[in-house]
């Protein structure tokens, strides 16, 4: 079959010139020019032209057939090679593909997902898979060099009352009980620190039963690590060194050795978000005072102690379509967007604004609501204005997060991060009675407007951990195993989870996480090519019901 003689197309070099070689690949195109046939054959490494004058050899061949080609190598031009006088053998016949298998394809995403195995044949997708592999390999090597050991933690675990909705798995061996697919290796890596491992990492698969988005999937992969006897600064320095090394080795990109650090409150005030894209400006400003002495549509709101925030776009005029898109973002956040420019005179009697500028205004009784909407509008602007350069990577750290967050839907206090994050030392004695002010040892890493990592220094005192759980109305008995472990000499420890999928999305300069995952779910959480989740056999359903209600 000549498999042992095969040469990958991408490895062909001048050393094989004028020699007979063997390639195996898929037919990408067939072009006839008089008596000569030009066949483009490709494998995972590249493509090459095969020039054939023998009609009989190719008359049964079509696009995406696999062929074995034995031919003489020669130059096509100063850069490219071609194969001449070939012997072509059909190895595997292909049906007519339902999509164009080229870097540029006109297939809808649902078609690409249904025939993902064909979509992945595209060289663009092959490059993304390879880049992901090289990235993960470099991460593993770097952690190994730093003295970390990779330890696999369980995927089937215990459902705990924190985080997102669990994926539940019925347990046949224990009646009326369920496993939960882990949302994070959090508890296990803390137990590993108590076990004296000190430096742990893994490339972890984690699961959260939540809606899919462009930057989120129900299952994802993260770089998970934990270290003992550390502080926040040590972890941040470690991550900066990791990314400086990996970006340079894998992507040949030199990033800054240290990342700027911002307080959560500062970022929200300036950008309306705790994950701003710092590649451009457009900071949010308080414009309330400009309207206080004028009768306008904001008068009643100002009298009711409301607030007016805005973003001023210097020397930028927005088209009607762009304004419409921004107003939709505002509407999604349950606020209205006022736009002031030379084409909109609604506010000209109230404020002075340069005719070349555009002012985007949001008014609301709640500053949090107004600023959050403006943050989303600011983020949307980069998709409508030419303000971001390619290959620009802007990292930042976010620190001093609130320990608690108030959920307006349930009218309850919840944990802002997770229930294992340590309160800052100045709040350690009274955080329960100061939920609106208490800060935590949580820190996030942001890249180009996406949260790519979240971590914290953990609680290692069982008394403090119980106090925090009780303040959130969480039964400490649910975590009895962890609280007991804390009583056997628990070191100070901390760590992070860094999202590989989001990182690869950013580095591949695509805006959809599905583009960098081999077999992703669609927007509805469905794996289109297998139709998962799917119904199971009725008899199996009956058996499970019978077992669970025994």
UniProtKB/Swiss-Prot annotation:
GO terms for biological process: aspartyl-tRNA aminoacylation. L-aspartate binds at residues 162, 208, 417, 458. GO terms for cellular component: cytoplasm. ATP binds at residues 208-210, 217, 451, 499-502. Its EC number is 6.1.1.12. It comes from the Bacteria. GO terms for molecular function: aspartate-tRNA ligase activity; ATP binding; nucleic acid binding. It is found in: Cytoplasm. It is an enzyme of class 6 (ligase). It catalyses: tRNA(Asp) + L-aspartate + ATP = L-aspartyl-tRNA(Asp) + AMP + diphosphate. Gene3D superfamilies: Bira Bifunctional Protein, Domain 2, GAD-like domain, Nucleic acid-binding proteins. Keywords: Aminoacyl-tRNA synthetase, ATP-binding, Cytoplasm, Ligase, Nucleotide-binding, Protein biosynthesis. PROSITE patterns: AA_TRNA_LIGASE_II (PS50862). Residues 186-189 are annotated as: Aspartate. Homodimer. Catalyzes the attachment of L-aspartate to tRNA(Asp) in a two-step reaction: L-aspartate is first activated by ATP to form Asp-AMP and then transferred to the acceptor end of tRNA(Asp). NCBIfam families: aspS_bact, PRK00476.1. Belongs to the class-II aminoacyl-tRNA synthetase family. Type 1 subfamily. This is Aspartate--tRNA ligase.
């Amino acid at each position: 079959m000549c498999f042992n003689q095969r040469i990958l197309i991408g490895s062909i070099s001048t050393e094989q010139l004028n020699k007979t070689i063997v390639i195996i690949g898929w037919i990408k195109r067939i072009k006839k020019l008089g008596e000569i046939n030009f066949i483009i054959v490709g494998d995972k490494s590249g493509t090459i032209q095969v020039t054939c004058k023998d009609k009989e050899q190719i008359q049964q061949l079509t696009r995406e057939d696999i062929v074995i080609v034995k031919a003489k190598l020669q130059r096509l031009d100063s850069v490219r090679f071609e194969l001449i006088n070939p012997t072509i053998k059909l190895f595997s016949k292909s049906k007519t593909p339902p999509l164009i298998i080229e870097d540029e394809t006109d297939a809808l995403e649902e078609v690409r997902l249904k025939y993902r195995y064909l979509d992945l044949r595209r060289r663009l997708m092959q490059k993304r898979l390879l880049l992901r592999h090289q990235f993960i390999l470099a991460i593993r090597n770097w952690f190994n060099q730093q003295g970390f050991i990779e330890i696999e933690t369980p995927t089937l675990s215990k459902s705990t009352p924190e985080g997102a909705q669990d994926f539940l798995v019925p347990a046949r061996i224990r009646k009326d009980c369920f496993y939960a697919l882990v949302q994070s290796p959090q508890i296990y890596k803390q137990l590993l620190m108590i076990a004296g491992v000190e430096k742990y990492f893994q490339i972890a698969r984690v699961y959260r039963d939540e809606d899919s988005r462009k930057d989120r999937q129900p299952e994802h992969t993260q770089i998970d690590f934990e270290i003992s006897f550390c502080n926040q600064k040590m972890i941040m320095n470690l991550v900066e060194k990791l990314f400086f090394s990996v970006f340079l080795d894998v992507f040949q990109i030199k990033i800054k050795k240290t990342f700027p650090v911002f307080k959560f409150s500062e970022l929200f005030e300036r950008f309306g978000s705790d994950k701003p894209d710092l590649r451009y400006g457009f900071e949010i400003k308080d414009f309330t005072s400009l309207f206080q002495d004028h009768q306008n549509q904001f008068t009643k709101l100002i009298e009711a102690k409301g607030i007016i925030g805005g973003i001023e776009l210097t020397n930028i005029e927005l088209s009607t379509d762009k304004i419409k898109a921004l107003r939709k973002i505002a509407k999604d956040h349950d606020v209205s967007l006022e736009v002031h420019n030379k084409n909109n005179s609604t506010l000209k009697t109230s404020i002075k604004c340069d005719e070349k500028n555009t002012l985007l205004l949001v008014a609301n009784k709640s500053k949090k609501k107004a600023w959050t909407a403006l943050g989303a509008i600011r983020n949307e602007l980069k998709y409508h204005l030419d303000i971001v350069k390619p290959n620009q990577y802007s990292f930042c750290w976010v620190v001093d997060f609130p320990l608690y967050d108030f959920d307006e839907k349930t009218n309850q206090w919840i944990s802002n991060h997770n229930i294992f994050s340590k309160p800052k030392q100045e709040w350690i004695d009274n955080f329960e009675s100061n939920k609106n002010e208490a800060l935590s040892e949580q820190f996030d890493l942001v890249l180009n407007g996406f949260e790519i990592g979240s971590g914290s220094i953990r609680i290692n005192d069982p008394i403090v951990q119980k106090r925090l759980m009780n303040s959130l109305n969480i039964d400490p008995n649910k975590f009895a195993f962890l609280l007991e472990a804390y009583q056997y000499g628990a070191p100070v420890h901390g760590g992070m989870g860094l999202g590989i999928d989001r990182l690869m999305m950013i580095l591949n300069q695509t805006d959809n996480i599905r583009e960098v995952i081999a077999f992703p779910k669609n927007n509805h959480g469905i794996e289109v090519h297998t139709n998962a989740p799917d119904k199971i056999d009725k008899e199996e359903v009956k058996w499970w019901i019978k077992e669970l209600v025994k």
